[in-house]
Regions:
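Extracellular/luminal recognition modules and glycoprotein regions
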Residues: 3, 28-37, 48
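Short, surface-exposed coil-to-beta transition loops
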Residues: 1-5, 18-19, 84-86
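Short, solvent-exposed aromatic-acidic interface loops
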Residues: 18-32
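Low-complexity intrinsically disordered segments
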Residues: 39-134
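Short beta-strand scaffold segments in enzyme catalytic cores
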Residues: 4-9, 90
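Short acidic-glycine loop/turn motifs at beta-strand connectors
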Residues: 10-17, 92-96
Length: 134
């Protein structure tokens, strides 16, 4: 039981099974994933230039947000629970969702995008040294 998802970064000239990926046991709904990706982009985290770095920083953002010591996994696409019976896989390019796999249900729409961004930032701005520009 969970609200599982995998976020994978689409990589050029690399087989999909080897794409850098992040497993979420909780908070895998699109209404949380899109704000997480937005915050990564806001912080200037490089996505396509170095996908392993991108996944590491995204996992830091997620970990700071959900807290605790469980519920995250990092690996390649083939290593993670992609057909997880919850939210499936979000295929990401430049921090935008460009494809979706193994999602068969209704889209979760419980959280407001801007409120979620604010909540994620409240746990990460200081860590990432981010200040809003006027």
């Amino acid at each position: 039981m969970g609200n599982r998802a995998v976020i994978t970064i689409k990589e050029k000239n690399i087989p999909q099974e080897d794409w850098q990926s992040l497993y979420l046991h909780w908070n895998g709904g699109r209404d949380t994933v899109e704000p997480l990706l937005h915050v990564a982009k806001l912080y200037g985290v490089r996505c396509q230039d170095d996908p392993s770095y991108a996944i590491a920083r995204l996992s830091q953002i997620v970990g700071n947000f959900i807290q605790g010591t469980t519920s995250l996994g990092v690996g390649t696409y083939k290593q993670l629970d992609t057909d997880n019976a919850d939210n499936g896989v979000y295929v990401v390019k430049d921090w935008e969702i460009v494809d979706r796999e193994y999602h068969h249900g209704l889209e979760q729409q419980e959280y407001d995008f801007n409120e979620m961004v604010s909540e994620i930032r409240s746990k990460n701005d200081q860590v990432f040294g981010y200040e809003e520009q006027d």
